Amino acid sequence: IQLEKMALVNMSSHFHYLRRVSDTGLEDATVTLCGTETSKNYVVDTDASAKKDNSIITGNKYADHFNFPLGHVDGDGKWSIGATARNQWFTAKIADVLNAEEDNPEWTGDGDYHIWRYVTENAVPGETQQKNGLTTGIVFRGKMTATADTPASLKDALENAEGTASDAILYSYSNNLYVTWKEVREFALKEGVGSGFYKAVFGTPENVPVIETDAVDAVYSDDVQSPDYLWNKWHNESMDDAARQAAFKNAATGSNFTIYQSSKEDDSVGYYCYYFYWNRHNDNGNDGVMGPMEFAVVRNNVYKLAVTKINRLGHPRNSDDDPDPL
């Protein structure tokens, strides 16, 4: 994965000119103007009550409260991350950020930080209210690239992508990446009937699925709920049917497949994935439990972030292709 771009999302569009703190994060009897933030209280935001009662999320009112909202709400009220949402983000090339002013010009070693931009205050009242749609974050866009160890079929797909519907669709399952559904079927059949991979692909068919060869026609699962059955109905019988495609994607992601499709971005063509980081303000040291003001942006703070390693593929371009969407 080659990280190419980074984007700021969910930056507050309103904020108090003077900091306020309270025990609850709300404008209640405990609020103190110009008060000191502690490990147990909260900075009070202008829209604290709307964040507390969840009305920003339930009412899809993100654009009323944030610049660069993470997701887009369509005419049917569906929130998702796709091309329209990404056009809302504040996006920069990572190379430009790394060429920006150094945080410590006197530093002569490796790995110095560079200044990106100012971000307005964004605090959320309560631990459980700290959600993806409300907290300020950074999104990294990565491009899949081939290495010397990349299998031939995957290397061909990555290096010859045109960003059209004719490009191979990649499927990730259990940390393995497959090129085309035919390859998924082939490996699932090798795993055998009792395997979880077999069931994820074929469901519980009454027939015996068969892989296509030069001498044998493919036999697809007759389990009408399985991804294999629905892929055949879409891809082989009605490729232009959006409803059939959606049904297949829903079944595939429901079986924990992540779907990656090529695209033409503004400056290149390829297969892209996305990594999300939520700005951590008051780290409680427990990754499994959120603490007060853990995910927030507070004035007069400098937040530093370093990407040192990538361990897995990121989220796909579109929410409908993601078994674990934000």
Stretches found by the model and what they are:
Residues 2-299:
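Tryptophan-paired
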Residues 280-326:
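C-terminal or late-domain output modules
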